[in-house]
Swiss-Prot record:
Keywords: Coiled coil. Gene3D superfamilies: Pleckstrin-homology domain (PH domain)/Phosphotyrosine-binding domain (PTB). The keyword Coiled coil applies. CDD domains: PH_rhotekin2. Residues 306-413 form the PH domain. Residues 597-615, 632-642 have a biased composition (Basic and acidic residues). The lineage of its organism: Eukaryota, Metazoa, Chordata, Craniata, Vertebrata. This is Rhotekin-2. It comes from Danio rerio (Zebrafish). Residues 30-105 form the REM-1 domain. Residues 505-563, 575-642 are annotated as: Disordered.
Length: 642
């Protein structure tokens, strides 16, 4: 039989320090937490080791590329990658040492402290103004010193670099495009900005003496001893790597200027910051800096972008002395509690029915339970200019109430640490804003918008467009007739409000006969072609005198064509000219003044005032015979035959 276990019971005293028995359940929970922490930190260490191995491989590849490159720009770009990889390796090594030290001295009481939430920091629109002399900037003839410039930005172990930019005296400022976003940033962050420079006109001569010496040392030792020596020569330490793999002087970058930005500089707009310029650097004379850095620094705390707490709460309302409860889905985010009827309203982007601000002025109280009103109640009071607004919520259980209390106090603490960045959410632009163009160019699809076609995106051939237009107008489009305008408003003539030009219509037997001939008759058969006119008679020319006299004072109203007719008017005129050129017409002449046609008996009986409105026309002209070699309509519309 097992001996009975020694069980000790302790009572917690608030005044004295509480002790925990090794056999109690709380002690077992603490042990489990330590085991979880010991399992968690090796995974973080493995993550850092993987990052270090990746940067080491990138560094080796960058050095090989630098040695194999023949162009100076490629050598400088590879040297930039090599410098960035070394900086990241140093940051990972220091981060691993910090985590190892924190793991050794970690205590359970340390986790009880209040820690602010993390966030994101983005920097964009980097612009460095230059201060050239007038003689160097305006009188440069291509003999100026060119330099390669790039930037490094660091927050903790996160390091970003920019692209390499070639600068000369013709540039007024150096611009770097793109946005660099740092994640998992604390509110007391320090963003270090460094500007590196290298001359482009210097020759890069590689000195491989240390590498040759290392190879001789490896070959002089045995195979086993050489393997042990290889990690020492090609270790992860950046200084050791640069000793065995030196960078040529012509491709070696130098730190020219630096600055440090913090939470106070995160305004969300473009600001100018001072740069600390190193005067003892030889390259400081190559690039005259104005001494400022223009950029946009944005900070986004997690409490402004993530839901810090969410769940159902019952709001207690008093309507005309009656108490009622309304169950609402509440979300704590961005300094306020948004209340909805259901979580689906958030996905549907429905406006919340109630918004309660949460800030340092908000008073949070817990109302004690009573027999008449069971349940844990939470009272939120926001004092204002007048009456203070009070909202009472009832939680489902004391545990839920405690979670909401912890989240509310944590949210207020996060706002106090992130300061002005919690007043309004700062947006992070995906692309850095660029300079606007000097001249605004026209859009490429504006030509299709000018055409009066039903669908601008529909690609049709010229023949199809004209054929469809002819079918819509029943052939009037090809003949060139104007569209009929609306009849004039005769009521306006008697009112006298608008001037109207009245025009008489001159009728002649020749025109009536021509209309009867040219009018389509679907029921009759095809008529026989008329014979050519005799050579001794001249063709007919109509003369209208009364019409010209009546219309000489007022302009003749012209019906407007649609935009498509205006587009293809030149094409139709060309088609009509080609059509008339194929006919064999007789030479035209003019009617002599002495030759007057005989008047008909019917016209002699008309009164004098009717004779003024009519003009007696001679015999109508006889059309010329058509050419036998007549082209079809599709042959005329073919652009190859033009």
């Amino acid at each position: 039989m097992d001996p009975p276990r020694d069980i000790q019971h302790f009572k917690r005293n608030i005044a004295s320090r509480s002790t925990v028995s090794s056999c109690s359940s709380l002690a077992m929970e603490i042990k489990r937490k330590k085991i979880r922490e010991s399992m968690f930190f090796p995974s973080e260490d493995c993550d850092i080791k993987e990052k270090m191995e990746f940067e080491m491989r990138m560094r080796a590849g960058a050095y090989k590329l630098m040695v194999a490159s023949t162009k100076k720009e490629q050598v400088l770009d590879a040297s930039r990658s090599l410098l960035t990889c070394n900086a990241r390796i140093k940051a990972y090594m220091s981060e691993a040492q910090k985590r190892t030290g924190h793991q050794d001295f970690r205590r359970p009481s340390d986790s009880q402290g209040q820690v602010p939430c993390k966030g994101k920091v983005a920097i964009s629109g980097l612009r460095i103004p230059l201060f050239w002399k007038d003689s160097e900037h305006f009188n440069s003839k291509g003999n100026t010193q060119r330099v390669a410039v790039f930037c490094l930005m660091k927050i903790g172990s996160e390091i970003f670099d920019t692209e390499m930019v070639i600068a000369d005296s013709s540039m007024t400022d150096i611009c770097f495009e793109g946005v660099k976003i740092f994640s998992e940033v604390k509110p007391d962050f320090e963003l270090t900005f460094e500007l590196y420079i290298c001359g482009l006109d210097e020759e890069a001569t590689f000195a491989n003496t240390p590498k040759k010496l290392a190879r001789k040392l490896r070959s002089s030792f045995g195979r086993s001893s050489g393997r042990k020596l290889c990690p020492l020569l090609d270790g992860g330490d950046p200084d050791t790597f640069l000793q065995s793999n030196p960078i040529p002087p012509g491709a070696r970058y130098s730190l020219l200027a630096y600055t440090t930005l913090g939470l106070e500089q995160a305004e969300g707009s473009f600001q100018s910051h001072s740069l600390i310029i190193l005067q003892n650097v030889e390259a400081s004379s190559w690039l005259p800096l104005y001494g400022n850095l223009c950029c946009q620094l944005v900070a986004q705390p997690d409490c402004m972008t993530l839901d810090m707490m969410s769940g159902f709460l019952s709001q207690q309302q008093s309507i005309e002395g009656l108490q009622r409860r309304c169950r609402l889905y509440c979300v704590l985010k961005a300094g306020k509690i948004s209340c909805y009827y259901s979580p689906e309203e958030i996905q549907a982007k429905v406006e919340p029915i109630l918004i309660i601000p949460i800030n340092k002025e908000t008073r949070i109280r817990v109302v004690e339970n009573d027999h008449q009103r069971p349940g844990s109640r939470l009272n939120l009071i926001n004092p204002g200019n007048g009456d203070s607004a009070s909202h009472v919520f009832i939680a489902e259980s004391p545990d839920v109430l405690q979670e909401w209390l912890d989240s509310l106090w944590q949210h207020i603490y996060d706002q106090s640490q992130w300061q002005h960045t919690c007043d309004k959410l700062m947006e992070i632009d995906v692309l850095s804003p660029r300079k606007p163009p000097l001249f605004l160019t026209k859009q490429a699809d504006s030509v299709y918008n000018d055409l009066s076609i039903g669908s601008p995106g529909k690609f049709e051939s010229l023949t199809d467009i004209i054929h469809n237009k002819i079918e819509e107008t029943n052939g009037r489009f090809l003949i060139g007739q104007e569209e009929e305008t609306e009849p004039p408003h005769w009521a306006a003539l008697f009112e006298g409000s608008r001037p109207i030009v009245v025009q008489k219509t001159v009728l002649s037997p020749g025109k009536e006969s021509n209309r009867s001939i040219t009018s389509p008759d679907t029921g009759s058969k095809k008529k026989r072609r008329a014979p050519p006119p005799p050579p001794d008679k001249l063709p007919f020319t109509s003369v209208s005198t009364n019409q010209e006299k009546e219309n000489c004072k007022g302009p003749k109203p012209r019906a407007g064509r649609p935009s498509l007719d205006a587009k293809f008017s030149a094409i139709i005129q060309q088609l009509q000219k080609s059509h008339t050129s194929t006919r064999k017409n007789a030479p035209l002449g003019q009617i002599e003044t002495g030759q007057q046609p005989e008047k008909r008996a019917e016209e002699s009986d008309l009164p004098e005032y009717t004779k003024k409105e009519y003009i007696v026309d001679p015999q109508p002209p006889v059309p010329a015979p058509r050419n036998k070699l007549r082209m079809s309509f599709r042959e005329k519309m073919n652009p190859k035959a033009w």
